[in-house]
Amino acid sequence: DILEPYAEKSYKRHLEKYISLGLPQEKAEEVAWKDLEKEMEQGFQGWEYKFNSVSSSRGDYPFITVTAGTNTSKYGKLATIKMLQVRQEGQGKEGHKKPVLFPKLVFLYDENLHGPGKPLEDVFEAGIECSRKTMYPDWLSLTGKGYVASMHKQYGKIISPMGCRAFLSPWYERGGMTPADEKDT
């Protein structure tokens, strides 16, 4: 969701460039989309490289978690699919690439959105393929049982993990640690 508005702006910038160069609308849209795909791929490659090669003065690497998988816009879907494809490709020299650890990827599964015939079938398939080849991403169910699912069902909010398994306690907009009323999310 965070990358969606930036992806849309980037696409529009590419589209305007190709239209101003005289390309027909359909061709301009096709080439602009390919440019956006390449930008997304390079952006996620850059993330992975930096998060796994730049350590602190103590030698620590940033432990970053990225949750994805629920955005139904074409830009949100593209971002999630490209992120998964980059992870699947790995980092390193050709022929010796390995999947990296950071950022930790978490796929948010919703039985109403994912699977055959559902709005995010392509995103779900990209997640399955990435898992098949790399053991990543981790999967959290928004419609199953457990803390994440219960918070999502009750408040419509997604709780992302910090690092491996730590989740922040809910913070309610008006009540803080405890909800002010049934509508406080």
PLM region spans:
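Conserved catalytic cores of very large enzyme subunits
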Residues: 1-185
